[in-house]
Regions:
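Short, well-ordered alpha-helices that flank and scaffold nucleotide-derived cofactor binding pockets
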Residues: 26, 119, 123, 168, ...
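General small-molecule cofactor/ligand-binding pocket signal
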Residues: 34-36, 103, 178, 195
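Rossmann-like dinucleotide/phosphate-binding beta-alpha-beta segment
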Residues: 145-217
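Alpha-helical elements of Rossmann-like donor-binding domains used by nucleotide-donor carbohydrate transfer enzymes
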Residues: 23, 116-120, 202, 206-209
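Phosphate-binding beta-alpha-beta segment of Rossmann-like dinucleotide-binding domains, i.e.
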Residues: 99-153, 179
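Short gly/ser/thr-rich secondary-structure transition/capping motifs
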Residues: 40-47, 60-64, 134-142, 189-197
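An N-terminal-biased, well-structured beta-alpha scaffold segment characteristic
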Residues: 1-101, 205
């Protein structure tokens, strides 16, 4: 154990178990850490945590998505680590003081979110949403022709972690994938053809499926 660093304080707002808290404590080493997250919120994506005023005054780092207006109540804040991939609301002028570092959870959601996207695509192709809506009324009418993804083309707008995961799932069922990103020279797993945003209008006509994974979507 080194010297206890009383000039730093991490306020952790995540809904952690005791064993997870222990892992954060070990990772922080000699920097003190206060846990204010509610473990009963596990399984929900609307995590909220009440940060006491005395901790706001001392916090040099916050882990979690505090309300943007609370950032101004943390005068010593040097680092905000969100649990979300999107951080748009913290990037508005006046939210974080100059010099504060903002990091996100990019890379944590690629598999789970892309699986949800794929499930929605599959449901639409197979008319599952129509059959599900008919179920409570005991209506078993034919919803029309189902579509196979095999041989179809998916246009993936935004090929970061989530977009590239989705492209790989599409490839696994026989789809051709076209990816769009700011720098088309950078390849992404699962993408057959990469183009820039300036070519979007040119390829829309070839897409059977359009999936978006860009900021604020």
């Amino acid at each position: 154990m080194g010297i206890w660093n009383d000039r730093k304080l991490i306020v952790n707002c995540l809904p952690l178990t005791e064993s997870e808290r222990a892992q954060f404590i070990r990772a922080a080493k000699d920097i003190p850490q206060e846990f204010v997250g509610d473990s009963t919120q596990r399984g929900s994506m609307s995590w909220t945590a009440a940060v006491p005023e005395e901790l706001k005054a001392k916090a040099t780092a916050v882990i979690g998505n505090i309300a943007p207006e609370e950032c101004a109540q943390c005068p010593k804040l040097e680092w905000l680590q969100t649990w979300s991939a999107g951080v748009d609301k913290y990037q508005r002028p006046g939210i974080l003081q100059s010099g504060s570092m903002l990091t996100n959870a990019t890379g944590a959601y690629g598999q789970s979110v892309s699986e949800h996207m794929f499930a929605m695509m599959w449901a639409i192709m197979k008319n599952l949403h129509i059959y599900a809506a008919s179920n409570p009324n005991a209506m078993w009418q034919d919803a029309g022709r189902a579509i196979s993804p095999n041989g179809k083309t998916a246009l993936v707008i935004g090929t970061g972690d989530i977009g590239s995961h989705f492209a790989r799932l599409c490839k696994n069922v026989g789809m051709t994938t076209i990816g769009i990103r700011r720098n088309p020279a950078v390849e992404a797993p699962g993408v057959d053809h990469m183009i820039g945003f300036d070519s979007l209008d040119d390829v829309l006509q070839y897409a059977d499926v359009i999936a978006m994974s860009v900021p604020s979507t």
